[in-house]
């Protein structure tokens, strides 16, 4: 399923090619690309739920304190390793993620049908969430820079 999400993001969304609106046509395209029907359905459902979260028009979280600290459930800790949880905290500290977008990311990660998700995969989920979150264009650009920009020059002398 995650491979399909990556394929769609890289070939349609990130490359700014118009995404096929017709789900049947998109399913056929993904089948021609070599993906299995059951995985295609899961990926498209995942994307629909992401869109539903964005379009709900109601706050994703109610009455939260901006200074609160996120405690992960056992299932979340099993799926999101320490390095990835640290990266989420880092992104909050530098204001790339808000409390709401962090929770959206965790929600989307937990719906991916993989037992664990590595840091590189988490970064792509974050990009997908920020891309689909109205008003977070700047955060999306910052996240893109963190992923794609390579540091100039030597890091150590």
Curated annotation (Swiss-Prot):
Q: Name one Pfam family in it.
A: DUF494
Species: Shewanella halifaxensis (strain HAW-EB4)
Identify the InterPro entries for this entry: Smg
Name of the molecule in the record: Protein Smg homolog
Membrane-spanning segments: none
Originating gene: smg
The UniProt entry's sequence similarity note says: Belongs to the Smg family.
């Amino acid at each position: 399923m995650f491979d399909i999400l990556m394929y769609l993001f890289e070939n349609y969304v990130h490359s700014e090619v118009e995404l096929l609106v017709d789900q049947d046509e998109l399913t056929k395209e993904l089948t021609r690309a070599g993906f299995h029907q059951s995985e295609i359905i899961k990926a498209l459902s995942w994307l629909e739920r992401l869109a539903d979260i964005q379009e709900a028009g109601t706050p994703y979280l109610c009455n939260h304190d901006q200074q609160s600290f996120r405690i992960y459930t056992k299932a979340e800790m099993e799926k999101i390793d320490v390095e990835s949880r640290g990266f989420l905290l880092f992104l909050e500290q530098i204001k790339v993620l808000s409390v709401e977008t962090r929770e959206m990311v965790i929600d989307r990660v937990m719906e991916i049908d993989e037992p664990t998700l590595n840091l590189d995969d988490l970064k792509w989920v974050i990009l997908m969430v920020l891309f689909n979150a109205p008003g977070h264009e700047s955060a999306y650009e910052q996240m893109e820079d963190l992923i794609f920009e390579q540091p100039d020059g030597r890091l150590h002398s």
